[in-house]
């Protein structure tokens, strides 16, 4: 139950790839949290099927602006976004009918409006097409800061948490996983654009929720606490922050898990390859690895390492993305939840 209203609450963990979201879910031990449900694929990702189409290397939609998509491609994607949304709706109704609060994670890239995606990837003049919005009985408003396919009215039924991580750690980490999945040649050929690793969308949604605090589903005296921002550094180095967060969202801090068993080789062999590529370090761990924090990191030094690891062209592109994301990251970091 929500600590604020006494009713089942909807908690949205909004992130970008490689922000230690799987580590956070591991620590929260959602399966052990009373009166909480976390569904979809691995705690959420209801809109992953749409992203799978957008990033399918066979049809190369990800390499083209929305203005160059065929009618069939548009229809397929619109149908998929709607199907994802309806699946999420059915799951929500089931969980809430049992009196359970929900905790769901989603990467911004998974439920991003394709017009916003094209403008980010190809420039603001890539399309003047109106934003895509799924059909929802509760409303169809789509304001400027809302970069998702979800209408404002639906977003405002959730209490949002934004998970961030230093771009100089998150961005190259994501590129490494793409190499593991697709090979270096394919990843490089796409010039990293397919990853759409951006903090801009998280900031935009954060500002959307700040502007609409009065409409959030919590008691008036709690609204200034939302939206919440968590930095991966604090999850890694300051467990008290997770305990505080747990208390704020109505979870039981006694269920938090900071140590676990390493997966055995036979267990790893049963895991889907793409999932292994994204989570191998977590599966092989027995607890939090404090070396994963950004403490003392220097972008100039990291860029030198990237050139050695990825080659000059890819490294320069990653560096450009990292430097371009720092203002949004620092903006959100300054507003993060802290236990001290």
Swiss-Prot record:
Q: Which SUPFAM superfamilies match?
A: P-loop containing nucleoside triphosphate hydrolases
GO MF assignments: transferase activity
- Keywords for the protein's UniProt record, in alphabetical order: Transferase
Under the heading InterPro entries, the entry gives: P-loop_NTPase, Pyrrolopyrazine_biosynth_F
Its pathway is: Secondary metabolite biosynthesis
Keyword Transferase assigned? yes
Positions of disulphide bridges:
none
Q: What is its EC number?
A: 2.8.2.-
Enzyme's top EC category:
transferase
Query: PANTHER family of this UniProt entry?
Result: SULFOTRANSFERASE DOMAIN-CONTAINING PROTEIN (PTHR48419:SF1)
Role, per record: Sulfotransferase; part of the gene cluster that mediates the biosynthesis of pyrrolopyrazines, secondary metabolites showing insecticidal activity. The role of ppzF within the pathway has still to be determined. The single multifunctional NRPS ppzA is sufficient to produce peramine via condensation of 1-pyrroline-5-carboxylate and arginine, N-methylation of the alpha-amino group of arginine and reduction of the thioester and the cyclization to form an iminium ion resulting in release from the peptide synthetase.
What is the protein named?
Sulfotransferase ppzF
- What is the name of the gene encoding this protein? ppzF
